[in-house]
Amino acid sequence: MTTTTAGKVNLLGLTQPQLEQFFESIGEKRFRAGQVMKWIHHFGVDDFDAMTNVGKALREKLKASAEIRGPEIVSQDISADGTRKWVVRVASGSCVETVYIPQGGRGTLCVSSQAGCALDCSFCSTGKQGFNSDLTAAEVIGQVWIANKSFGTVPAKIDRAITNVVMMGMGEPLLNFDNVVAAMNIMMDDLGYGISKRKVTLSTSGVVPMIDKLGEVIDVSLALSLHAPNDELRNKLVPINKKYPLGMLLDACRRYISRLGEKRVLTVEYTLLKDVNDQPEHAEQMIALLKDTPCKINLIPFNPFPHSGYERPSNNAIRRFQDMLHKGGFNVTVRTTRGDDIDAACGQLVGQVMDRTRRSERYIAVRQLAESESAANRN
């Protein structure tokens, strides 16, 4: 359980079983967990005195041993298209970004999992910031909590603005595994936000051992940040591919999807970069690569940021690529750029990373994870 500098337990990031354990640890009945969890997530409460069905003696006990603390809101911007972006400060001192995208009757919240990112994908502005820290479970779910309160949609399940959550913000979610899984469990819990497992999506650049582990502990939708149809190009665009090449990666994704059943499919994300990965031969390679993978493809025209070195393809090039994939038998959509006027579009999230020296440490951790997994498989 996460404790603050004051030694108090932050209840915001606790799952229902963890809350039950907490109440037992302070000599209370387990059913109190459900009462308090509803107050936190359905009503956005951060003051124990507001919990009217909790007795005064217990409220005083909670004040002494616990708190409800989300990230600090630094700023909120609203795009001309209705997209919202929150910049929030986490305990490390860094700022991360959360984006809400309204579209039709759906509202999707894009949530960050780390302050910065160690994977250094060449077309992503977050990776250029380096890596600072993993977010705690409270800091991950706290982004949902903050957004929900900002819309005034409490209780959370009445006229809810947030219908979908995607772990596609800053960071690689599978490198902050335990905290992200805890937060997603709260998202799906009826005592939390009651979001369907089909509407909670985790996006990964491809940490293969953790994809397999994810399938063992939770049932959420999976998205793969592919961005290249062959290993040579993907090694340049998504460096973690050197550790987990495409054959290994897609095998892991297929194993994950097969566990889910229910006609679930992998979402493949592909950022289109002018004259880099948008040519007809790339579409042909992609058709061959994904022919045995149940998937839908989401094409993302590159969203420029300073000094990236990349450009957005022309509309004709985007349509040509989409048409070729359609003819190859795939369900293909082109993501509409949203929120670019407030730097909230895909690939533009940067936040403010206070310590940019840890990228190499995170790569070492990835390598050690792969080596230990390989040793386990040999045994």
Swiss-Prot record:
Disulfide bonds join 110-346. The active site is at 97 (proton acceptor), 346 (s-methylcysteine intermediate). Its EC number is 2.1.1.192. S-adenosyl-L-methionine binds at residues 171-172, 203, 225-227, 303. GO terms for biological process: rRNA base methylation; tRNA methylation. Keywords: 4Fe-4S, Cytoplasm, Disulfide bond, Iron, Iron-sulfur, Metal-binding, Methyltransferase, rRNA processing, S-adenosyl-L-methionine, Transferase, tRNA processing. It is an enzyme of class 2 (transferase). [4Fe-4S] cluster binds at residues 117, 121, 124. CDD domains: Radical_SAM. InterPro entries: Aldolase_TIM, Methyltransferase_A, RlmN_N, RNA_MTrfase_RlmN, rRNA_lsu_MTrfase_RlmN/Cfr, rSAM. SUPFAM superfamilies: Radical SAM enzymes (SSF102114). Its cofactor is [4Fe-4S] cluster. One of its GO terms (molecular function) is tRNA binding. One of its GO terms (cellular component) is cytoplasm. Binds 1 [4Fe-4S] cluster. The cluster is coordinated with 3 cysteines and an exchangeable S-adenosyl-L-methionine. Gene3D superfamilies: 1.10.150.530, Aldolase class I. Residues 103-343 form the Radical SAM core domain. It catalyses: adenosine(2503) in 23S rRNA + 2 reduced [2Fe-2S]-[ferredoxin] + 2 S-adenosyl-L-methionine = 2-methyladenosine(2503) in 23S rRNA + 5'-deoxyadenosine + L-methionine + 2 oxidized [2Fe-2S]-[ferredoxin] + S-adenosyl-L-homocysteine; adenosine(37) in tRNA + 2 reduced [2Fe-2S]-[ferredoxin] + 2 S-adenosyl-L-methionine = 2-methyladenosine(37) in tRNA + 5'-deoxyadenosine + L-methionine + 2 oxidized [2Fe-2S]-[ferredoxin] + S-adenosyl-L-homocysteine. Its main location: cytoplasm. It is found in: Cytoplasm. Reaction proceeds by a ping-pong mechanism involving intermediate methylation of a conserved cysteine residue. Belongs to the radical SAM superfamily. RlmN family. Specifically methylates position 2 of adenine 2503 in 23S rRNA and position 2 of adenine 37 in tRNAs. m2A2503 modification seems to play a crucial role in the proofreading step occurring at the peptidyl transferase center and thus would serve to optimize ribosomal fidelity. This is Dual-specificity RNA methyltransferase RlmN. The lineage of its organism: Bacteria, Pseudomonadati, Pseudomonadota, Gammaproteobacteria, Pseudomonadales. The gene is rlmN.
